[in-house]
Amino acid sequence: MKDSYFLDTMNKINQKNDEDFQSEEFHCPVEATLSLIGGKYKTLILWNLIGKTLRFSELRRLIPSATPKMLTQQLRELEEADLLIRKVYAVVPPKVEYSLTPLGTSLRPILESMYEWGSQYLLNQGT
């Protein structure tokens, strides 16, 4: 069951239209995953969007160390990877909302495991 899920996911990843992404050859599923979520703020963006729709300004408040330029870049890369949806409203001032796609939502157990591991690590470090 898990093997077929990962094979299906890998097939979807390898069928992406992005030329740079298509030229990559992955030797391991972990490598493919990290190529999608390995950016400096990507995991934090994904974590904050679990079960929510947020505007750019809300993401900025939740991830204060990200500059607007870097946050925009990371959001674009996640959108190109089909992990999030960017919805633009034709209003003044401009309104843009971000939410996870089904593929992005499928990362939830991984992100929750990272959260648990990080919590234990910090506890053991006395932080």
Summary of predicted features, one role per range:
Residues 55, 119-122, 126-127:
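Short, basic amphipathic alpha-helical segments that act as recognition/interaction helices
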Residues 30, 108-118, 122:
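Hydrophobic alpha-helical core bundles mediating ligand binding, dimerization, or RNAP-core interactions
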Residues 74:
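Residues within the DNA-recognition helix of helix-turn-helix
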Residues 1-18:
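Short, intrinsically disordered or compositionally biased N-terminal tails of bacterial proteins
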Residues 90-114:
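Basic, amphipathic "hinge/linker" alpha-helix immediately C-terminal to the N-terminal HTH DNA-binding motif
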Residues 21-70, 90, 97:
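N-terminal helix-turn-helix DNA-binding core of bacterial DNA-binding proteins
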